[in-house]
Regions:
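C-terminal amphipathic helix plus adjacent low-complexity
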Residues: 150-156, 160-195
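Glycosyltransferase donor-binding loop in the core domain
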Residues: 3-4, 87, 120, 154
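Hydrophobic alpha-helical packing elements
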Residues: 128-131, 141, 145, 158-166
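Conserved acidic donor-binding segment of nucleotide-sugar-dependent glycosyltransferases
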Residues: 115-126, 134-140
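Short amphipathic alpha-helix
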Residues: 15, 91-92, 166
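Conserved catalytic-core segment of nucleotide-activated headgroup transferases in glycan assembly
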Residues: 1-70
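Nucleotide-sugar-dependent
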Residues: 7, 58-68, 72-97, 103-113
Length: 195
């Protein structure tokens, strides 16, 4: 879950509600912080933690990770927008670390999720519906994808495996701090000329 994601998930809601209609009690939803998403689910088999429609309250992180850990599937929809393309793949990393299979959009996640190996990528609401159906029906596939994703994170994405890269990046930023500050000031003047 996240706040203000209606444009990302709204095109998928008919497929989600159709899965609810087809599978009934086999499905249980844990929604974090997005009350709009929670309200659109046509089932009573759902739980909500944190977040209000106006985004004034955010669920504690431990509620988010507990929900991931208790889930089989994590829905990771992001429309292809400039804002979303600037996001990281952290939700995939968190999902994989807690054993939930990612059903993700290609925006952000296509660079990390290996479709059919460490999760599933969809390119349309129709493909989302097909892949959601597949994940619901196939416990063996969910288990294999979750294990592969967990192994990928353990082998490639832990912080201690990249410390030298992080240190080098921070040293470079520190060395270029005056250049960055000049760029920042130029952007402030451009976007806020009366400031």
């Amino acid at each position: 879950g996240a706040l203000n994601r209606r444009p990302d998930w709204e095109p998928l809601m008919p497929a989600i509600n159709e899965a609810i209609r087809r599978y009934g009690d086999r499905l249980y939803f844990r929604v974090i912080s997005d009350h709009g998403f929670y309200e659109e689910l046509r089932t009573e088999a759902k739980a909500f933690a944190g977040g209000m429609r106006d985004a004034s309250i955010v669920a504690p992180y431990e509620h988010y990770t507990a929900a991931l850990h208790a889930s089989d599937i994590a829905l990771l929809p992001l429309r292809d927008t400039e804002f979303n393309r600037a996001k990281s793949d952290l939700k995939f990393i968190e999902s994989a670390g807690h054993g939930a299979v990612a059903l993700a959009s290609p925006t952000v996640y296509a660079g990390t999720v290996r479709d059919g190996e460490t999760g599933l990528i969809y390119h349309s609401p129709e493909e989302f519906a097909e892949k959601l159906d597949l994940l619901i029906q196939r416990a063996d596939l969910r288990r294999t994808l979750a294990e592969n994703a967990y192994r990928y994170v353990a082998e490639h994405r832990l912080l201690d495996q990249h410390l030298d890269e992080y240190i080098a990046a921070y040293r470079e930023m520190f060395a270029r701090r005056e250049e960055f500050e000049q760029d920042r000031r130029r952007r402030v003047e451009e976007f806020f000329p009366k400031l």
